[in-house]
Amino acid sequence: MKKWTIAASLSIGVLALSACNSDDEIVAETEAGNITKEEFYEELKDVNGESTLQQLVTVKVLEDNYEVTDEELEEEISTMKEGFPSEEDFNTTVEQQFGGEEQLREIMYVSMLQEKAAAEDVEITEEDLQELYERKNTEIQAQHILLENEEDVAEVQQKIEDGEDFGELAQEYSTDTGSAENGGDLGYFSAGSMVPEFEEAAFSLEAGEISDPVQSTHGTHIIKVNDVREKEESIGEFEDVKKELEREILLNRVDQTQIQEKINKLIQDAGVQINVEGMEDLFEAEETEENTTEEDAQG
């Protein structure tokens, strides 16, 4: 999203320049020669023009289909502030990472528009929310063995079935250097701490149970749960945290590729016409690329 902010800032400059009356207007003077508005505009267009225009059109199309209210944006910013020890810490971090709160608001605004587009195709039931709420009020203590190839998976599974010690197997086989030397011990954790595939498997186990192999972006896990207990401090009343739970489920179920495909479809349906010389086919190229990807997947 930072990229969008930079692009948007550049586009403001480009639009301001294009609004000037004369292409010969001087925007910079040097002893070596002057730089005209036209030269500056053409350079900005050549370097950042396509990405800037793509981002501006994307935001315009999203705004035509979805709405993020001032109240929603304020609530989001307030929630972020609660995660910092003080408002001064929040302001310092925001200044360092985003260039200021105004830039952060722009980023959050576009992010929330994208989330609304993604949420349209995802069904989240009351049961889903209740299940996540219960998990977040529960913590489990587990060990795991992370493996990289099928041969090791089969070998470790067999040794577990033969009764060998799980911790010793983790020390011998696990590629997770952070936990292997401790017998694969991950300590206590609650929902939202691990990758979704791992978490789903771990929270489905009772104390003392060992999972089947679980695939994640890190490799193949074999998980053993040793203890399940209620957290000492609740995350809050269900109705108070319901919106946060819904967002977490949404982000776990939708990846960036799916969001981009949805946005591309909205842009296609919006009948976008580009009137900048050299960029007339900007979104047609995106559409062709998307269709090619779909054909490759089907083939």
Curated annotation (Swiss-Prot):
It catalyses: [protein]-peptidylproline (omega=180) = [protein]-peptidylproline (omega=0). A lipid is attached at residue 20 (S-diacylglycerol cysteine). One of its GO terms (molecular function) is peptidyl-prolyl cis-trans isomerase activity. It is found in: Cell membrane. Its EC number is 5.2.1.8. A lipid is attached at residue 20 (N-palmitoyl cysteine). Residues 137-227 form the PpiC domain. Residues 1-19 form the signal peptide. It comes from the Bacteria. GO terms for biological process: protein folding. GO terms for cellular component: plasma membrane. Its main location: membrane. Keywords: Cell membrane, Isomerase, Lipoprotein, Membrane, Palmitate, Rotamase, Signal. It is a lipid-anchor. It is an enzyme of class 5 (isomerase). Belongs to the PrsA family. Plays a major role in protein secretion by helping the post-translocational extracellular folding of several secreted proteins. This is Foldase protein PrsA. It comes from Oceanobacillus iheyensis (strain DSM 14371 / CIP 107618 / JCM 11309 / KCTC 3954 / HTE831).
